[in-house]
Amino acid sequence: MVRHGTPRTAFPTLFTERRNIMKNTIFTGAAIAIITPMNADGSINYDELGELIDDQIKKGTDGIVICGTTGEASTMTDDEHLDCIKFAVKQAAGRVPVIAGTGSNDTAYAVKLSQEAEAAGADALLLVTPYYNKTTQRGLIAHFTAIADAVNVPIILYNIPGRTGVNIDVATVKELAKHKNIAAIKEASGNISYAAKLIAECGDNIDVYSGNDDQIVPLMSLGAKGVISVLSHVIPAETHQMAQYCLDNNFAAAMKMQIEYLDLINDLFIEVNPIPVKEAMNMIGWNAGPCRLPLYEMSDEHKAKLRASLRKHGLVK
């Protein structure tokens, strides 16, 4: 098995107090939006998930985001969803924070799942904006507030309008940031101007994380605290280092890495996430397995392009 990257020597404090308000920063650096390895029959491969969590932590990953988009939470049963969260908490064993995806377009269900994740030991929750039955900005405030009122762990809002069809307005984030449990936002709109305004107007009361690997350095140069990454699957140490350079204000070194890996990042999203990253993990020696339908096997043309990109960066022979 070819597994690249070198471990870092020490981990920063998992939770650091912000100066301006009494909230905690969940993590700084690079957290992984981790895949859910599957067996050939589509069942969850917990052995491989455990190995992957351990490998990521050893190589410097700063947090584990379980049951997110990349983890195929939308095709999990309720029992599988909660079991994965419990498993990740046990496997991480306090070495890095575990952030559980508990968002839904059903507020009552999101409250229930969030409470269960908290009881299971999740350090924080990731809550996507309601999708399909799209709501207004006032509805978003009511939705997220209902969940935040029901738990006692920090929440990361998840703005990804390309999937949900709704963008969280900066004014809405500013209002939500007044809640003691709403600590951060994963910004995955791809709109740098929006991100800049978000950080400028809300950054004193809420942390911002990049949700796009091709914008790690741009967003962190504006003041984002890190990234929730897919790239970290294949180059965990390097992804951590890129984010760490930003935290150390060494943006020249960080941008050099960002540019170096842009082709790999693009190819990891050549089809709908997480199809390419699971294929990449299989290629480099992990047993990531297939995706669950409706996500379908990658085309041969795209497989060849992805393999060439992995080869260029020394990840496969």
Question: Where are the predicted features?
Answer:
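A general structural signal for well-ordered alpha-helical segments in protein cores
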Residues: 49, 81, 85, 110, ...
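Short beta->alpha linker loops
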Residues: 102-105, 189-193, 211-214, 234, ...
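Surface-exposed amphipathic alpha-helices with a cationic face
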Residues: 86-93, 115-118, 148-149, 177, ...
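Ligand/cofactor pocket segment of small-molecule handling proteins
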Residues: 122-124, 131-136, 140-225
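Structured C-terminal cap/extension of enzyme domains
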Residues: 214-317
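Short, Lys/Arg-enriched N-terminal segments with co-localized hydrophobic residues
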Residues: 3-21
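Active-site beta->alpha loop and helix N-cap motifs at the rims of alpha/beta catalytic domains
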Residues: 24-32, 36-165
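Short secondary-structure boundary segments
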Residues: 68, 129-130, 188-189, 212-213, ...
